[in-house]
């Protein structure tokens, strides 16, 4: 069905407010803002955020840019934190301590360092257990917050502070990990790969599907970094456009078709 995204956005509150400290030209703020705008206005959210660029720039106690409940958690356990909160919510609802008609969604944000590497075990566990939550990876291809060190999301031959391109090596020598396909292999209900800007409808629609699909969902979102990638801050949209058009970052999604249990 055709719709006007600007009109939809105008009628929904921004759940990541202005005043955060993210860099100009960074892909992470529009990712968080658009993902959360996919929520229905009446629904509440619990945000779990791994340590990283987004966390240190949006939540500096006692200040916060988040309007929903927010949990800052360690690099390695953002998915585990969200899965625990989701399990507690279900238990409280079952006990009648929370209203049945109040929907709470559990959304986790983590960078590629906290998702591809340090937090992969807890992410895999949360997805396999079937928690009703969405994990959003904002993938900028390195540990940008701590000084642009390589991660397993860093492309081959990329220049980072721990894989410097020069006369000894031409940059990172290993190929990047395909985390989206790893999540597909978990056979979870929904997996999507999208971009920060340039195609807002794609990000919005995939976010909406992920949030309102029952069970675990995963979104891998390309999030260019002007400091780490070395582009002028006004080129964010062009960088995203090139990533898609060159098929470096193809846009796709997979929805698991529900198959009924066999009967005897």
Region spans (language model):
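Conserved thiamine diphosphate
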Residues: 7-10, 99-102, 151-209
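Short gly/pro/ser/thr-enriched loop/turn and capping motifs at secondary-structure boundaries
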Residues: 55, 140-145, 226-228
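Hydrophobic/aromatic ligand-binding patch that stacks against planar heteroaromatic rings
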Residues: 37, 125, 182, 209-210
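Glycine-rich, Lys/Arg-enriched anion-binding loops that position phosphate/diphosphate groups
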Residues: 198, 202, 211-212, 218-237, ...
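Residue-level detector of conserved catalytic or cofactor/ligand-binding positions
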Residues: 255-263
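Cofactor-binding active-site loop characterized by glycine-rich and histidine/acidic residues
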Residues: 2-135, 148-158
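Short, conserved beta-strand edge motifs with alternating hydrophobic and charged residues
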Residues: 137, 192-194, 218-222
């Amino acid at each position: 069905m055709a719709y006007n995204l600007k009109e939809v956005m105008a009628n929904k509150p921004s759940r990541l407010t202005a005043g955060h400290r993210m860099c100009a030209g960074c892909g992470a703020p529009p990712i968080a803002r658009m993902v959360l705008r996919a929520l229905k206005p009446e629904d509440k959210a619990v945000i779990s955020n791994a340590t990283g660029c987004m966390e240190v720039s949006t939540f500096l106690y006692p200040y916060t840019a988040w309007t929903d409940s927010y949990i800052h958690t360690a690099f390695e356990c953002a998915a585990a934190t969200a899965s625990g909160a989701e399990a507690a919510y279900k238990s409280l609802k079952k006990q009648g301590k929370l209203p049945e008609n109040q929907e709470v969604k559990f959304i986790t944000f983590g960078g590629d360092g906290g998702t591809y590497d340090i937090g992969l075990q807890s992410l895999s566990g949360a997805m396999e257990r079937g928690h009703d939550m969405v994990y959003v990876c904002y993938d900028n291809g390195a540990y940008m917050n701590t000084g642009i060190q390589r991660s397993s999301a860093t492309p081959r031959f990329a220049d980072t502070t721990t894989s410097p391109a020069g006369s000894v090596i031409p940059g990172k020598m290993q190929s990047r990990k395909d985390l989206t396909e790893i999540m597909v292999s978990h056979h979870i209900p929904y997996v999507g790969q999208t971009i920060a800007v340039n195609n807002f409808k794609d990000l919005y629609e995939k976010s909406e599907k992920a949030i309102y699909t029952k069970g675990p969902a995963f979104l891998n979102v390309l999030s260019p970094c002007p400091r780490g990638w070395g582009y002028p801050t006004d080129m964010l949209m062009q960088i995203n456009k090139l990533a898609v058009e060159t098929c470096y970052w193809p846009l796709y999604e997979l929805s698991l078709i529900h198959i009924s249990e066999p009967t005897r």
